[in-house]
From Swiss-Prot:
One of its GO terms (molecular function) is acetyl-CoA C-acyltransferase activity. One of its GO terms (cellular component) is peroxisomal matrix. It catalyses: an acyl-CoA + acetyl-CoA = a 3-oxoacyl-CoA + CoA. Pathway: Lipid metabolism; fatty acid metabolism. This is 3-ketoacyl-CoA thiolase, peroxisomal. CDD domains: thiolase. It comes from Saccharomyces cerevisiae (strain ATCC 204508 / S288c) (Baker's yeast).
Amino acid sequence: MSQRLQSIKDHLVESAMGKGESKRKNSLLEKRPEDVVIVAANRSAIGKGFKGAFKDVNTDYLLYNFLNEFIGRFPEPLRADLNLIEEVACGNVLNVGAGATEHRAACLASGIPYSTPFVALNRQCSSGLTAVNDIANKIKVGQIDIGLALGVESMTNNYKNVNPLGMISSEELQKNREAKKCLIPMGITNENVAANFKISRKDQDEFAANSYQKAYKAKNEGLFEDEILPIKLPDGSICQSDEGPRPNVTAESLSSIRPAFIKDRGTTTAGNASQVSDGVAGVLLARRSVANQLNLPVLGRYIDFQTVGVPPEIMGVGPAYAIPKVLEATGLQVQDIDIFEINEAFAAQALYCIHKLGIDLNKVNPRGGAIALGHPLGCTGARQVATILRELKKDQIGVVSMCIGTGMGAAAIFIKE
């Protein structure tokens, strides 16, 4: 780890872990006309990659059918006049050009007018959350009053494309030590985190089993029903239930799974890593004053978003830097946060971030995370927003965060209303 990164880390972590409730918390709870608020946030079920309900459809189909359901549930003033939506941003990772053409087409087919501009975004695993930030920033600076953030991914149909996560063609870059680190497989970066920071296989399997147990319990209790919209498939069947969670998963049952990336001594397995998945999610945002004028419901409030860069070879540590940065930007501390939705790309990297920041495990992913639910890359950040707004209670504060391939981290803060 570079000296500069260590210095930044020390400053941010010390700031984030200060003692006592921050002075800024009460002021953040005050409602202002210029606030960016969330009017609606929903998602599809998450389908298992290559064999799940969405295996035979691609992202254009998923997005179009999701939008039909999502728009159909918009508050009447918006549903009656979609011209009020002034911008659409859609996160996606694996499609060529982040799906700029097919996802714009899906928006038009769903009734969003051609006069509403569209932008395709790809910041790898944070793409869905980056779309939320893109719309929020445009509202903040006065470019728009209402916007729609989306995230969609079909890992089934696009993950096996030639070089789906990019390539380096320049011979000069191929010889450059730092540049080559961007091509390190994600599983190997997680092995680096586990080895460098001494995250044991046992701890990883226990964390993963806990994720499965929480997700299966939440699914059985119907806690996801309010956030999941049904997707009608070409054969007429309906998918509206997550396919990843399963019963009777224990650390012991996971311990028998072989390492996936480093034979014999590796600790990363299919059981303690996120699932390859397909899914779509959407977040509708507005300026509070406009939402009030239109009598739109307010689920929560967007507060801030921050990203950081970290060494690509240990990219999973990203949230350990992004979370302190967004907390510092808002004057908050770790203990001010009621729930953390930290994407479980891998158990080792999630555990490192949780331990480094001194986060109470009971506050992390109370309904399970990507290990149990799945991680459709471009969808995940938007999905996490839909989830955390159901987990939080009135006036509680939540953080959504994830690591990002090639060495980054992102984090955002939301308040429930």
